[in-house]
Amino acid sequence: SAASDVYKRQNFAQYLNMLDHCTMITGRRDLYKTNGEDVNQQIDEIKSTMGNNHPKVLFIRTAASSVKAKGSAGSVCGEMLSDLGCVNIADSDKSMLDDLSLESIVAADPDYIFVTTQGNDTQAAMKSINNLLTDNAAWNSLRAVKEGKYYVLDKKLYNIKPNARWGTAYKQLADILKQ
């Protein structure tokens, strides 16, 4: 849409900027407070509970035809994980962004693995990741897998955009990371 071309909303700061402009245009500054400032305060409170823990994470977006690691920049979940103090293994191994291999994942051995789907066919998207990664015996050697820290996340919150649910999205991730 035209609005999405003008307003990038990959992270909460960009969402706040868009909300600021839209509520100025509409004259509904009360909505900026409710949906912007109040949510920003909620997110800041969540971030303040994270302490000095900086877990290594892998964030994967899977679709029917592809499985891609995503870095901290340019994806909703990647940016949130970074905000929460995580170290994304794809940030230090850029080859993962182009060619995700189980060998590189095993070498980095992340503490957590997060997956979100893309597209309408969630079943086909999960089949893609199973074929590439999870069906391989080496997958089960990963610390995150052994410790039950492999999570499939809601694409509406972590791939598309959480919009009014930014606070919820941050809280769910923080709760997982504090387990």
Predicted regions and their residues:
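Solvent-exposed, acidic/flexible segments
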Residues: 8-15, 28-32, 36, 70-74, ...
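Loop/turn elements at helix/coil->beta-strand transitions in domains of secreted/extracellular proteins
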Residues: 53-56, 109-112, 146-149
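Structured C-terminal subdomain patch of bacterial secreted/periplasmic proteins
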Residues: 13-27, 115-179
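Short, small-residue-biased leader/transition segments that mark boundaries at the very start
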Residues: 2-7
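Extracytoplasmic/secreted envelope proteins and their assembly/folding machinery
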Residues: 1, 12, 16-23, 36, ...
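Basic- and aromatic-lined ligand-binding clefts that recognize polyanionic substrates
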Residues: 31-84
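Flexible, glycine-rich surface segments
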Residues: 64-109, 115
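Active-site-proximal beta-strand/loop segments in catalytic clefts of secreted hydrolases
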Residues: 8-10, 60-63, 92-93, 116-118, ...
